[in-house]
Regions:
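Short Cys/His-based metal-binding microdomains
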Residues: 99
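Glycine- and acidic-rich phosphate- and metal-coordinating loops
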Residues: 52-53, 84-94
Length: 134
């Protein structure tokens, strides 16, 4: 299983600031608390778009951006890199210039891709603990 070490990366595109947070998740129960922490850390952001993959469970959210322009591109990058047990949140501070649907897809994709380029990828082996008593 390929996963990541926690990391973040910031880019500015047409005056909008995009902050990508990549987070390792141990279980699905962590997702809501990590999202809450990020919203607290980046108060006042315009959007908190995210996607996660945990085993066979995948989900994304556009958080008010036009449908399919934020969460799905984030998820696509995670899937294309065969990552698992990962939550990716891209925080956007609107800079006053509308990017259009295509521009948003490119911006969110670039944000996650740039963050991944600066993130340590970990190859985890799944093991089972077997206890034998005599």
């Amino acid at each position: 299983m390929k996963t990541i070490e926690d990391s973040n990366y910031t880019i500015v595109i047409n005056k909008s600031k995009f902050i990508c947070e990549l987070l390792y998740i141990n279980n699905q129960d962590e997702i809501d608390s990590k999202l809450k922490d990020i919203k607290h850390k980046y108060k006042g952001a315009t959007h908190y778009c995210y996607a996660y993959i945990y085993d066979n469970n995948k989900r994304f959210n556009d958080d008010g951006e036009p449908g399919g322009t934020a969460g799905m591109p984030i998820l696509n990058v995670l899937e294309n890199n065969n990552l698992n047990h990962v939550l990716c949140v891209v925080i956007r501070y609107f800079g006053g210039i509308k990017l259009g649907a295509g521009g948003l897809v490119r911006a969110y994709t670039k944000s996650v891709t740039s963050c991944l380029e600066n993130t340590k990828i970990i190859d985890k082996k799944e093991c089972q603990l077997i206890k034998i008593t005599f």
